[in-house]
A protein has these predicted regions:
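Histidine-centered divalent-metal-coordination microenvironment in nucleic-acid enzymes
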Residues: 1-8
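Active-site-proximal loop/hinge segments that shape catalytic or ion-binding/gating pockets
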Residues: 11
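C-terminal accessory/tail domains of diverse enzymes
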Residues: 7, 15-230
Length: 230
């Protein structure tokens, strides 16, 4: 999910050519609520076979620029104000389009099982949470990484980072702990949160990943049962 924060028709993600405080506060909120956002974006057991270390999918709660080992990625360099279309097509006239309006950040954990309505509402709640956190900028600084965290030389940094849940059962536990943030201002009703938690726990998959990791036959059965989205 790529997102940007708009105000009066203007993108608020950049200021003076760098990521703005507004953007970094929103990212901090996503860092804090990332564990429970999986309850909306990773909703069946096969989701957690994707969220494993050393793959393209994220497992650690961190963010960075153009870095595919992070959970929240800041893509491209829209702050450069370069008309890439004109560079690729030199006979075309420059568009004079303000490319800084395109700057987004990407939440990389959700997959095809996501309930999009709940997910987008949850991400909006997380961004709002970041605006309300007095230490949001410190959280953003602490969770920023500019290296591949899966390389051996960066293992000390990796150890400092929290991890995403590894099952629907763990995701349900995270949502239960953080539910107050989503119920605030009546964005999510308590009954809806209860229903999501109950559904996630119904899979009883707390140890499923380790149980089937060496069994291609069981893995295939799970894929056929749950991999029906997207």
């Amino acid at each position: 999910i790529h997102m940007r924060i708009m105000k009066d028709g203007k993108n608020q993600m950049l200021k003076d050519g760098v990521l703005s405080e507004t953007a970094r506060k929103a990212i901090a909120g996503m860092m804090e609520l990332a564990p429970s956002i999986t309850a909306f974006g990773n909703t069946n057991p096969t989701s957690y076979f994707r969220l494993v270390p050393h793959q393209e999918a994220p497992t650690n709660i961190c963010w960075g620029d153009r870095n595919r080992s992070v959970l929240v990625r800041v893509p491209l360099g829209w702050s450069a104000k370069t008309d890439m279309c004109m560079l690729a097509n030199p006979l075309e006239a420059p568009s004079n389009y303000d490319t800084t309006q395109k700057q987004t950040v990407e939440m990389r954990s959700p997959d095809g099982s996501a309930d999009l309505y709940q997910l987008i509402a949850g991400l909006a709640v997380a961004c709002r949470r970041g605006f309300e956190m007095p230490d949001a900028l410190e959280v953003a600084d602490r969770t920023y990484v500019n290296v591949n965290i899966h390389k051996k030389e960066n293992e000390d940094k990796l150890k400092q980072l929290a991890q995403l849940p590894d099952s629907c059962a763990a995701s349900a536990d995270c949502l239960e702990k953080q539910r107050a943030a989503f119920e605030k201002y009546n964005v999510f009703s308590p009954a809806m949160i209860d229903g999501i938690i109950t559904k996630l726990r119904s899979y009883e998959d707390k140890t499923l990943r380790s149980e089937v990791q060496n069994s291609p036959e069981e893995m295939l059965k799970l894929m056929e049962k749950y991999f029906h989205c997207g």
